[in-house]
Amino acid sequence: MTIIDCNKEMRGYHSEEVNLSNAEQAEMRGRRDNGRTRLRNGLTKAGHPLPKEFSSQGSYAMRTMVQDDACDYDIDDGAYFDKEDLKNSEGDYLGALDVRKRVRKALKDDRLAYDAVVKTNCVRQMYPDGYHIDIPIYRTTCSKDIWDNDIIEYELASGDEWTKSDARKVTSWYNDAVGNELKAGESDTSQIRRITKLTKKMARSRNTWKKKTTSGICISKLVVDNFVARSNRDDDALRDTWKAIKLQLEVSQRITHPVFTDKNLAEEGDECVIFFRECLGEVLETLKVLDEHDCTSKKAGDAWDEVFNTTYFSAQCTTDNTTSKSLLRPAVAATASLSFPSYPVQPNKSSGFA
């Protein structure tokens, strides 16, 4: 445990510059809901069946999105259709690409600045503010096992194929990993969740890092696998978790999928994972100043500023020092206005305990 305690500053930084504000979250929910309405209306107008349900996924659902100066936010909102509802006019099942094209056409709205585009695993709707909504499309199949129980499977329209997948399982995995407190309400009471967001913030703290570093799900998996809890010390928990992650990535860059054991999020030698490991090495080197015997609050604040490419921590140190000086300033000036009696003052009660 480092001598200089920066937990207060780290919690403040997370609250003010990492965590999304309620207003930002509300705006994103509004865009998401408008997109759902637009898709329903477009499909209805074309005479196509509607999705049976929508389900938010990814960092939005896991509550691990972080603030971005360029509003480069990615909201994943899955659309789930019954397989029997995804047929063409001849009654043949639609291919994965054809389904994405149908959804893209249904989202068409002349009032929007950008048309939706078909991507490999989703249909993407861009917005002028900088962020976008990705709509992965799933089809649901239902069969029976030998005991006549229902078996429900989900397939993602990926490329030209339908592949077994359901991102909601990843959300469940993360929520189970960080604790039940994440499943109730807006409050952020989990240290591991804060560490996840702080790590993502660091990984994207420079424009030159954003396009080179690894994905949010890879970072989340690495944090969960290597998390080091430090009660009431988010600064120590963050640093120790980073050390553990770097050690793992020095041995192997392969990151296993949290749900599907036959898949990997990243393979050996993955360039984005290697870049993330190098970034970790840089920031951990910067933080070595915390171990010096003569480390001060200012030095610690400057180090954390460099790590996150911010001025927040040093500003807090300046504010704290100003407050301390005002509290400790001698009251010499005030004595001039004080007057003292020239005669003995008798106490108004007897000595001792009354």
Regions found by a protein language model. Give the residues of each.
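Glycine-rich, often proline-containing surface loops adjacent to acidic residues and nearby aromatics
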Residues: 11, 73-85, 170-182, 197, ...
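Extended, alpha-helix-rich binding/interface surfaces that flank or overlap catalytic cores
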Residues: 66, 131-197, 350-351
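Conserved catalytic core of two-metal-ion nucleotidyltransferases
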Residues: 26, 39-43, 62, 94-147
